[in-house]
């Protein structure tokens, strides 16, 4: 660099009037004859100064700064588009995402069989994806996935036995529509109906109703396509142990290709929604659990409000009044007012005149409100109180088909942790379900957690699937399911990161203070794998206390010895030792 600069100076010097003067200076700098120490130092530092000035001049003229540079807006960095062969797959809350070059969509049982056989032979990953809705991204794998969206046919309906056989890629909503003409429907539903049937049974999904088991209990038989043993048929009669294990198999034992489900007659329900409080709930809890076919509580933190939702078949002897005291606009107007007030506080008056606000649903308004300051406890409390008032003004009845009534608007993108724990029997509820909630609400207030509403509490009967969180050999056992949430109402990466950190702090405190005391275990679609090695070891040991991990891993090694169906989450939850693998 120095030689180049000297050459440039020489060229400029030769063309200038004072070329001789500069030439002598350069010669002096480059001379090799010995000089006195002080003279040599002087010329050395003079050379450094010239070098610095030359570099600055070269930089200035090579990369000129535009005159309006100080007034230009920063342009955000834009990622290049993904290659055509790279698929981005995320769950519905966009909390987990992978990019993969292998996303297969077989359209038949033979095609699925061949795909798994090839992956097994080449030791490649091919994780069953389902609809990919699980909040924890349980089905995601960047190494490769298989989706059964093209295997979505109804294969047969037996109206007398009230059963239906379907390909596992059919969505719940599509299945319900297909069953309608036969006068049938499913026994129970989860909150949303976009799941594929194969996925909804594999993760132990559930609805609500202390007499109704999780959805995997509706499975009578199924065809499981495995990497090592091909397609196998399982039922209560054919290999019952593996059948019950595979019903809630987390996609680790095989890809569920076909399922026969027990249905019920299509029926209507009357939903009664009303607001209560903790004391009233305690007085009536046992009676409500036994009397109502479907029931759930929506607890609102920092208030004494409990929203009770009861659903039952219509009674010919009693017709409820369906008229409500308030219209939809009246019920939600105070939430709109809070939004306008909050905009003035956090933004400008101009934005408070947004005409779109009047078209937003309650859950959309709640998201808008939370976006303003999602982690400010006082702001969240104001929103929770507005929600309590909204439900008070929304009390009343509505009637519809069961699949319509049992759906629930969960709100926008969110983090969620749902635990399941025993609650006694239907004849003798132990009331620990209400104790759990009481402790949880006290913990939230003690720790100043900006916990939004609702905390949803539901119940189910037990399941005979040993990997189900509601698994029990006692037929009359009931289980309570409690979900805590934090919404992700914004696309701002920094804000989402802050909400995520606060949510995991919230979840950690509930785990430390509540889970062991109530034998609570997380829903498989909502369990998160800790990054800390010690915490992971504790989780693995804890899972072994509740679930038949050795039997599950043994079946995995028999049906999938090359771990084609596994992903990082499954491997961390259920690590297979070398000894187990060799066996």
UniProtKB/Swiss-Prot annotation:
It is a single-pass membrane protein. Its cofactor is FAD. InterPro entries: ALO_C (IPR007173), FAD-bd_PCMH (IPR016166), FAD-bd_PCMH-like_sf (IPR036318), FAD-bd_PCMH_sub1 (IPR016167), FAD-bd_PCMH_sub2 (IPR016169), FAD_lactone_oxidase-like (IPR010031), GL_DH (IPR010029), Oxid_FAD_bind_N (IPR006094). The chain crosses the membrane at residues 45-61. GO terms for molecular function: D-arabinono-1,4-lactone oxidase activity; FAD binding; galactonolactone dehydrogenase activity; oxidoreductase activity. SUPFAM superfamilies: FAD-binding/transporter-associated domain-like (SSF56176). Pathway: Cofactor biosynthesis; L-ascorbate biosynthesis. Its EC number is 1.3.2.3. It is an enzyme of class 1 (oxidoreductase). GO terms for cellular component: mitochondrial membrane. One of its GO terms (biological process) is L-ascorbic acid biosynthetic process. It comes from the Eukaryota. It is found in: Mitochondrion membrane. Residues 37-78 form a propeptide. Residues 1-36 form a transit peptide. Residues 95-266 form the FAD-binding PCMH-type domain. It catalyses: L-galactono-1,4-lactone + 4 Fe(III)-[cytochrome c] = L-dehydroascorbate + 4 Fe(II)-[cytochrome c] + 5 H(+). Keywords: Membrane, Mitochondrion, Oxidoreductase, Transit peptide, Transmembrane, Transmembrane helix. Involved in the biosynthesis of ascorbic acid. NCBIfam families: GLDHase. This is L-galactono-1,4-lactone dehydrogenase 1, mitochondrial.
């Amino acid at each position: 660099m120095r030689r180049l600069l000297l050459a440039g100076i020489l060229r400029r010097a030769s063309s200038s009037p004072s070329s001789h003067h500069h030439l002598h200076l350069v010669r002096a700098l480059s001379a090799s004859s010995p000089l006195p120490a002080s003279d040599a130092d002087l010329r050395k530092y003079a050379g450094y100064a010239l070098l610095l000035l030359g570099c600055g001049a070269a930089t200035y003229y090579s990369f000129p700064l535009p005159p309006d540079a100080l007034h230009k807006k920063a342009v955000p960095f834009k990622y290049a588009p993904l290659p055509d062969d790279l698929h981005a797959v995320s769950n519905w809350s966009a909390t987990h995402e992978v990019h993969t070059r292998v996303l297969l969509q077989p359209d038949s049982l033979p095609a699925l069989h061949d795909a798994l056989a090839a992956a097994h032979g080449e030791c490649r990953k091919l994780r069953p994806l389902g609809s990919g809705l699980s909040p924890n991204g349980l089905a995601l794998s960047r190494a490769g996935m298989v989706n059964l969206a093209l295997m979505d046919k109804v294969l047969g309906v037996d109206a007398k036995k009230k059963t239906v056989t379907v390909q596992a890629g059919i969505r719940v909503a599509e299945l319900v529509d297909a069953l309608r003409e036969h006068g049938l429907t499913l026994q129970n539903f989860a909150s949303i109906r976009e799941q594929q049937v194969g996925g909804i049974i594999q993760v132990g999904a559930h609805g609500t109703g202390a007499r109704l088991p999780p959805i995997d209990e509706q499975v009578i038989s199924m065809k499981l396509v495995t990497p090592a043993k091909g397609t196998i048929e399982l039922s209560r009669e054919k290999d019952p142990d593996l059948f019950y294990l595979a019903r809630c198999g987390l996609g680790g034992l095989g890809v569920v290709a076909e399922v026969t489900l027990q249905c019920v007659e299509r029926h209507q329900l009357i939903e009664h929604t009303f607001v209560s409080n903790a004391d009233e709930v305690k007085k009536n809890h046992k009676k409500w659990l036994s009397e109502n076919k479907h029931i759930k509580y929506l607890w609102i933190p920092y208030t004494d409000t409990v929203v009770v939702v009861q659903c039952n078949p219509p009674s010919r002897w009693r017709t409820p009044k369906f008229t409500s005291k308030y219209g939809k606009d009246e019920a939600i107007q105070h939430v709109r007012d809070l939004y306008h007030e909050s905009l003035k506080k956090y933004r400008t008056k101009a934005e408070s005149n947004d005409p779109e606000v009047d078209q937003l649903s309650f859950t959309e308004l709640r998201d808008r409100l939370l976006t303003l300051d999602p982690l400010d406890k006082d702001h969240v409390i104001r929103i929770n109180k507005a929600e309590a008032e909204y439900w008070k003004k929304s009390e009343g009845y509505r009637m519809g088909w069961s699949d319509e009534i049992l759906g629930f608007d969960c709100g926008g993108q969110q983090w969620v942790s749902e635990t399941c724990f025993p609650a006694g029997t239907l004849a003798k509820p132990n009331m620990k379900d209400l104790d759990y909630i009481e402790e949880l609400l006290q913990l939230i207030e003690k720790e100043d957690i900006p916990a939004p509403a609702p905390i949803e509490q539901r119940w189910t009967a037990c399941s005979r699937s040993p990997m189900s969180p509601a698994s029990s050999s006692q037929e009359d056992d009931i289980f309570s399911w409690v979900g805590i949430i934090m919404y992700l109402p914004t696309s701002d990466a920094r804000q989402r990161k802050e909400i995520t950190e606060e949510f995991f702090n919230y979840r950690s405190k509930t785990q430390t203070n509540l889970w062991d005391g109530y034998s609570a275990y997380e829903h498989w679609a909502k369990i998160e794998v800790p990054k800390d090695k010690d915490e992971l070891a504790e989780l693995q040991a804890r899972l072994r206390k509740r679930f038949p991990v050795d039997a599950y891993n043994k079946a995995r090694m028999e049906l999938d010895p090359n771990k084609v169906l596994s992903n990082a989450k499954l491997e961390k939850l259920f690590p297979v030792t070398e000894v187990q693998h060799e066996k």
